[in-house]
Amino acid sequence: MVSGKKIPGVIFVKDENDMNKKILAVWFVLLIILFFFLKSGFTSVRVMRFSETQETTVRELTDWKVSSSGQKDENGNYISTYTIKVPLIHNSSETMMFYTTHSDVSVYVEKEKIYTVSTNLSEKTFQAVRSDRWNQFSVEKAYEGKQLQVVLKTSYKSVAEQAPLFLLGNELDIVIRELKAALLSMFLAFAVFACGIAMCIYYVFSGKSRLKNYRTIYLGIFSAFIGFWFLINIPIVQFLFGNYMMLEYISYLIFGMLPIPFILFEKQIIDQKFGWLLSLIAVYIMLVQTGRVVLQMTGYMDLKESQTIIHVVILLSIAMFILLGIVNMYVNRGSEESLISRVNVIFLLVIAAGSGIDILTYYMYPQRGKEFNCSKFALLLYICLLYTSPSSRD
């Protein structure tokens, strides 16, 4: 039962389950309003231009001649070359932007280098492995009709075989275009994050009578961590943030902190006799992630090994979710929560399938595989299910 004490911004009722539903309903309505505000904001935004700048639309350049041998060079890297004639430039210059993963980039106009960025693929230090980035450079009016060549060098065959999306136009227009394209992904990430923050606040201010139910704070911490991790890994968000190195550190550390709720609250999540196994998996994942950052910083691990490890960690996380669901179903068999446990297992399998699809998408289409939309959607449904379902551990 919840205390009737009034706190600004929080409405308390006598029935706890009724309050949960009302809070969830308000949270959902706020997210819908946020979605439409974001959408209308991106649609109606005005682009400030110089007086001599003409109104142009963002163009996607597709007429590239692609040259890729599919063989490694002497340093063990794959090289792909994209060549095109510079199209009509409407103003004194336009901006070209494209997103690359794990690649060195060089751009030439008639063999004159105009842009280059190196991730130092031959190096193994963390400082050198700023792998995912937006490339942008100015295409001058004088370049019209000349040969533009983009050379990508990468350690991954799957990356070399996937052409980037080349966009030409006003820089702000390109950013707005990508924001619109990533609107659903940002919305889902923010929804998971906001759900976690809301549950943490609710747990703190709901009164001492509810402090025995640790499920709320566990879900809140986990949701906030993974929601923020989802958000900062969206490519266009990385561009807006600007500091790629800072995002690399934050991303790795947050992913390493995801198992913390499992360790802190495992006794409240599942029966104690199964808790040690869940904690063991969680500790292992945390140690792998922490070790990964340390090894990269000291230069003992290269990018390819790092990419493999993060997917192993994701797969272990999937296994942990499935284990959690199956054990809960086993513990609650024959009880009133049996049906709820079965539904939980179904949603956990959906999360596992979504994460598997996201990993597969990453290997098949590296440019489009970082938004994790399947995982976000499944996880959001599962969090809402757990938050609204009754619990026997109050």
Residue locations for each model-derived region?
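Accessory carbohydrate-binding/adhesion or oligomerization-edge regions at the termini
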Residues: 18-75, 154-177
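Short beta-strands within extracellular/lumenal beta-sheet-rich domains
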Residues: 76-87
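Beta-strand-rich ligand-recognition modules
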Residues: 109-147, 153-163
